[in-house]
Amino acid sequence: MTSAQRKDDHVRLAIEQHNAHSGRNQFDDVSFVHHALAGIDRPDVSLATSFAGISWQVPIYINAMTGGSEKTGLINRDLATAARETGVPIASGSMNAYIKDPSCADTFRVLRDENPNGFVIANINATTTVDNAQRAIDLIEANALQIHINTAQETPMPEGDRSFASWVPQIEKIAAAVDIPVIVKEVGNGLSRQTILLLADLGVQAADVSGRGGTDFARIENGRRELGDYAFLHGWGQSTAACLLDAQDISLPVLASGGVRHPLDVVRALALGARAVGSSAGFLRTLMDDGVDALITKLTTWLDQLAALQTMLGARTPADLTRCDVLLHGELRDFCADRGIDTRRLAQRSSSIEALQTTGSTR
């Protein structure tokens, strides 16, 4: 099977998986304490966020998806158009296909051609050489670089990598060599606290936890196996909400993706400490089912609804959501107990001295 065929398979299987998903994930175990007089005025609300020297006007981004075949090049064209029209940052799919076969360069370059002034993120794997990382950056004139780590995907992948020991030193080399921010991301299995602390030591600028709850690439790769004999890896890892809770009080900026279904999930993730929140499969499905105009409408609606939620919760900025009281339930609460995370502090933080000094209220 060629790389292009595999990329097309990934799109097809991701859409099938999204259509079959039950709709519930651990974001549903996160709720806000409703303070009925916490609301502020909509003109006082900003969606702007910043991290690692990066400033975005919105706290959401179109996360890494695809590229490398004629079909996926058209998808990237439309994703870039939607990003341009809404001001939403966008990440490429893995550019390993381009590194191996430069003839598919246009399927990635279109992300910049259609979005010349937007924030575009290149995506590579953790075995990429420094020179090839720079090639990927240069091709799309990237503003930041994602390095994806995906042992649970590689393991059932028929042609997958089986050697992972080089990843840590190679991430460190790339982070030291390139002159744009480096973000290390999982692909749907989550980053533990220990992993994020290690990434900070390696010199990366941010981590995207990309937890369980959305596209399951172990399931996708197992679906490509003749015998489907790695079904026991389906659902491997920690949820996005669990990863964010595990990362409390770590200095390295954390982004969130994985299982983000709607603006309430975005607000939940921001309240748990994410600086920005990405989504992939839901945006892809809208594009494939209804076209680029529908995706533009969806992104615009999300931004409007995010501002509405911040207004109701009394959060002038996305960062202010970390002062809102949140309650944790079910298995997510059990995870916190086992990992030594104080859930009471999260439920009572609006009345803390720091929150009072910052907001002047008990929101």
UniProtKB/Swiss-Prot annotation:
Keywords: Cytoplasm, Flavoprotein, FMN, Isomerase, Isoprene biosynthesis, Magnesium, Metal-binding, NADP. GO terms for molecular function: FMN binding; isopentenyl-diphosphate delta-isomerase activity; magnesium ion binding; NADPH binding; oxidoreductase activity. It catalyses: isopentenyl diphosphate = dimethylallyl diphosphate. Substrate binds at R6, K7, Q153. It is found in: Cytoplasm. Its cofactor is Mg(2+); FMN; NADPH. GO terms for biological process: isoprenoid biosynthetic process. FMN binds at A64, M65, T66, S94, N123, K185, S210, T215, G259, V260, R261, S280, A281. Homooctamer. Dimer of tetramers. This is Isopentenyl-diphosphate delta-isomerase.
